[in-house]
């Protein structure tokens, strides 16, 4: 079983030093950015630790200065699935880099024996390399579509997060998470959207019912 006295902060520094030796300046800058964002996430969310422990430890230290590298990959799902798409204002390049860098970090942790098994974390990061930029592309497409096609008159309005339940070319069927029972649709969207998005992605926005059926009124987030 891997053991070390190093903290997460020390291991992040070692990881970046190793990457700087092999990467060009532009690529290394992306690594620094993603590790900085990941460190900010860890300090804010303390994955795997409860509020009581958080209160006790923050009196005398930080998450990354307290815990060791075996704690790092526990935050991957929340970092890649929530923090990056919801809390970080960034483009597709940074989203792709988030998956690339965290995947490299997970493999590096296993190679260095700082973590025992990082296969699941590597797979989660691999998915993020594809899905996060794709979700941003869908958001951009829907933003443009809504700007041009948002209805002015409607009878019913649902502001919520919506699971994508069914996809056909140019059409989505959506399931509101909290505000409505059942699936609504078809909701017309650009065909490119239905080529890129996947079932069970989360669309945050407003859907309204018009005389011609359900339509998107606002879209503010798309999350894989």
Question: Model-predicted segments: where are they?
Answer:
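Non-catalytic DNA-binding core/recognition domains of DNA-processing enzymes
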Residues: 24-109
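OB-fold/S1-family single-stranded nucleic acid-binding modules
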Residues: 208-224
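Basic/polar, acidic-poor N-terminal "presequence/leader" segments
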Residues: 1-30
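OB-fold (S1/OB) nucleic-acid-binding surfaces
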Residues: 166-188
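Flexible interdomain linker/hinge and immediately adjacent N-terminus
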Residues: 59-64, 121-146, 154
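Short, charged hinge/linker segments at domain and secondary-structure junctions
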Residues: 48-57, 111-132
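Short nucleic-acid-contacting surface segments enriched for D/E, G, S/T with interspersed K/R
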Residues: 189-206
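Structural detector for short beta-strands of small beta-barrel domains
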Residues: 140-171
């Amino acid at each position: 079983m891997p053991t070390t006295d190093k903290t997460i902060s020390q291991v992040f520094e070692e990881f970046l030093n190793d990457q700087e030796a092999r990467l060009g300046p532009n690529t290394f800058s992306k690594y620094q950015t993603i590790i900085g964002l990941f460190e900010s996430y860890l300090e804010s969310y303390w994955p795997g630790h409860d509020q009581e422990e958080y209160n006790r430890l923050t009196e005398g230290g930080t998450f990354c200065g307290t815990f060791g590298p075996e704690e790092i990959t526990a935050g991957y799902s929340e970092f890649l699935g929530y923090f990056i798409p919801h809390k970080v204002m960034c483009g597709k390049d940074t989203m792709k880099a988030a998956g690339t860098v965290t995947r490299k970090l997970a493999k590096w942790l296993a190679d260095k024996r700082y973590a025992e098994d990082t296969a699941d974390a590597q797979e989660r990061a691999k998915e993020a390399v594809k899905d996060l930029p794709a979700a941003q592309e869908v958001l951009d497409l829907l933003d443009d579509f809504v700007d041009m096609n948002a209805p002015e008159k409607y009878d019913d309005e649902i502001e919520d997060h919506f699971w994508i339940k069914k996809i056909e070319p140019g059409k989505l069927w959506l399931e509101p998470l909290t505000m409505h029972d059942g699936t609504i649709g078809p909701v017309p969207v650009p065909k490119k959207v239905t080529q890129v998005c996947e079932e069970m992605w989360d669309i945050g926005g407003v859907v309204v019912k018009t005389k011609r059926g359900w339509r998107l009124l606002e879209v503010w987030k798309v999350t894989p």
